[in-house]
Amino acid sequence: MSKIQHVTAQRFALPLKEVLSDAMHGDHTHFELICATITLENGLSGSGYSYTGGKGGHAIVAMIEHDLAPYLTGRDSVDVEALYEGMNFHIHYVGRGGIAAFAISALDIALWDLRCKAADKPLYEMLGGASDRCKAYRGGIDLNYPLPKLLASIEGYLDEGFDAVKIKVGKAELAEDVKRVRAVRQLIGDDIDFMVDANYALDYAR
C-alpha cells in the first residue's frame, strides 16, 4: 500500500514585484517554482518543491518526468533515505549538483511529506528534534537597493521580530559595500547578528 503509483511535476513562473539583484547572478525578474507530487497506491500524496532564480526550471521538470519519476514508480516510499541515495546514484553519471540536485530536492521533500502524513507527526519530530523552534534570520536580494531603501527593509525585518539579518554585497566599488555594511550595523546595533552574502563574487583581496 505504500508503493509509489505515480509522480508528477509542474513549473510555475512567479513574477517579482520589482527587479532584485545580486553580485553573481545579476537581475532577477521572476523566480521559478518546481512542484512535485508523489502519489501512493493507497491514495496518499506528498508534495515538495524547489525553486530557481529564473533559469533551468524546464530542465528540472524534464529530469523528474523522464528520469526520476520512472525510477521511483513502483518502489516502496517508506525508506526515504534509501530512495534519496538511489535517486542520486540513478543519475550520478550526469551529475550530483545543479539540475539533478534541484530535481531530487523536490522529490525528497515530497517523500518526507508522505512519511510525516503516514505517521501523523510534524517534520521536526520525525527528524528527532527536541524543539519546535529554530534560529532564523531575514534577508533579501537587495544589492540594487539604494541605501535608504536597504535600511528601511532592515527596519522591517527587526519589526517582524528577527534578531539576525543578512544583506547582499559585491558592488563594483568595495567602498560602497563598506558604506552599506557600516550603515546597517549602526542601524541594528551590536546585539543583532549580521551577515553579508557576496554570492561568490568577491576575490580574496576584497
Q: Which role does the model predict for each range below?
A:
Residues 1-195, 199-205:
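N-terminal capping/lid subdomain adjacent to the active-site entrance of alpha/beta enzymes
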